[in-house]
Amino acid sequence: ARKTRLADGRRVIDQPFVRRNLAKCQAGGEALKLMLWKQAWTLTHSRLHPAEASTAKVYASEFFVEAYRSMMEIFGAAGKLRARSPGAILAGRVERMYRSALILTFGGGTNEVQRDIIAMAGLQMPNYKA
């Protein structure tokens, strides 16, 4: 983004939406790292609570979906191209990782179920009954 220029000569990195997306990815990644370090510590001390594990799963899966979506927005149409497509940026890895990240929102338990675990086990809220 620093070296890439738009048709009018401006650098991509100077665009407000690019800076905002990169900042959100950086901040979200740092928050996730701290969350996982805490989870690793509590696990090694046999203190891991189901609500903490569910919180990390929900946050991580949704963070990666949003981060890859943000990267595809920055790359424009070329970021949405699959591997071996002419003009694909980063050999189509961003598009592939975006699709893979979507699976994380339901693999290992849907995020809706994980939110129920957080509510019941972490917040002592009653079980939701439709």
Show where each model-derived region lies:
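Alpha-helical interface subdomain recognition
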Residues: A1-A130
